[in-house]
Amino acid sequence: MPYFTIDTNKPQDSISSAFLKKAPNVVPKALGKPESYVSIHVNGGQPMVFGGSEDPCPVCVLKSIGCVGPKVNNSHAEKLYKLLADELKIPKNRCYIESVDIEASSMAFNGSTFG
């Protein structure tokens, strides 16, 4: 159930369909999860400042039941920062990505929790 949310000050209409097609491939490959469970949410046009500047920036949260943690977060970050830089043209030094391990009993899908 990986969930990757991106809040950004880039206008919503500047989020390309190429990004929306590529992101659901990058996230599950990074985590080793099936694409059928991946959710990507992009919130464009947010009033945001990063480092005192209104230049394009996102704040991202990656949530997953397992597959995140100290031993793997650097690998995930590398892939996600590359996605953001390549597709949204956002420099790596203008973004935070938070990785959150969700308890299976705290996430529901199709009428029941995962655990």
Swiss-Prot record:
Entry keywords, A to Z: Cytokine, Isomerase, Secreted
Taxonomy, superkingdom: Eukaryota
Xref: Gene3D superfamilies: Macrophage Migration Inhibitory Factor (3.30.429.10)
Keyword Repressor listed: no
InterPro entries the record matches: Macrophage_inhib_fac, Macrophage_inhib_fac_CS, Tautomerase/MIF_sf
Pfam families according to UniProt: MIF (PF01187)
Location in or out of the cell: Secreted
Aminoacyl-tRNA synthetase listed as a keyword: no
Catalytic-site annotation from UniProt: 2
EC numbers: 5.3.2.1, 5.3.3.12
GO cellular component: extracellular space
MF terms (GO), sorted A to Z: cytokine activity; dopachrome isomerase activity; phenylpyruvate tautomerase activity
Predominant subcellular localization, coarse grouping: secreted
Family affiliation: Belongs to the MIF family.
Entry function: Tautomerization of the methyl ester of L-dopachrome. Inhibits migration of human peripheral blood mononuclear cells.
Protein name per UniProt: Macrophage migration inhibitory factor homolog
Provenance organism: Wuchereria bancrofti
